[in-house]
């Protein structure tokens, strides 16, 4: 992995941690949605993750097809361009199910660079 990719992966992991902090006290999509600040902060950080994916090299993405890079970038586009029409239940599913998986995959990529 190139140094550029390594630092982007680290940044993505930090961004995931922010989302976790902003959303950890909530038990449902509706509960999170009612808190404008935390909801908006989490959504903005999903956009940031999508932007970070766009900066990764094609080589890294091709070698790590277990991560659906296009789906992550597509979420960024949906949130950035259709913010008022997003389904909060889908966002909640992403936060509670998909984000921990992505974090694990990115940590594995980070560890590969240390070998």
Walk through the language-model features, giving the residues of each.
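Solvent-exposed interaction patches of small proteins and small membrane subunits
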Residues: 1-115
């Amino acid at each position: 992995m190139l140094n550029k990719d390594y630092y982007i992966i680290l940044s993505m992991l930090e961004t995931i941690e922010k989302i976790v902090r902003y959303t950890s006290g909530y038990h449902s999509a509706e509960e999170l949605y009612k808190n404008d600040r935390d909801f908006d902060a989490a959504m903005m950080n999903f956009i940031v993750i999508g932007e970070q994916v766009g900066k990764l090299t094609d080589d890294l993405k091709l070698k790590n097809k277990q991560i659906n890079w296009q789906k992550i970038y597509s979420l960024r586009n949906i949130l950035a361009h259709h913010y008022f029409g997003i389904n909060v239940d889908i966002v909640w599913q992403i936060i509670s199910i998909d984000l921990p998986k992505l974090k694990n995959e990115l940590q594995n990529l980070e560890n590969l660079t240390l070998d």
